[in-house]
Amino acid sequence: MKLHIYILILFSIFSFIVPMTVMATEEPKYELIEKSGKLELRQYQPMLIAEVLVDGNMDQASGIGFRLIADYIFGNNITKAGNSQKIKMTAPVTIEPRSEEISMTIPISLKKNSGRWQVSFAMPRKYTLDTIPLPNNKQIMLRKIPARKVAILEFSGFVNEKNTASRAQELLKWMDKKNLISTGSIELSRYDPPWTLPFLRRNEISVGYAKNKAKEF
């Protein structure tokens, strides 16, 4: 009985701390244009990202890409003063396919056993390309993304290639009903540390969008 109560107390504390930790993490700024349940249209401000290209399937690429960029932000870098500097962790961690074989048609498949993936972190807003420390690992690239409009589907739970493709399909169908077309690759973003309980996790499928002018006539 005591053990049961102890577990419940730990669970309650953990459930409280994890969301608070995520809330304290800096995220890219955006304006909410429209919301329908878990589906949203957003206008993102320009942002600076650190990215790396990784070969393999989605799970392999996510792990390798995360470790490479984490190594950079934890101090494997050089400033203009010649020293290293830790960069504050941000959310989310994003992965997207970089294979010409993946199209934006329905049904969509993100299963690429020998594909190439881009894994990226958004950098803290205080940095610019001129002020951010440079990575010592030449695999890591720094890039500024311009302001853009993005369609989003938020979901919780574990992430795998099958449910990611299913969510992407759901998002594209919703966009089609709203007379919107995709303008880039499907992206998967994860906001939480790996120890977060599945039902507390925040994941997002996203893609840039524009009006489908062909259907307006």
Give the role of each language-model region.
Residues 2-217:
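A solvent-exposed interaction/effector surface
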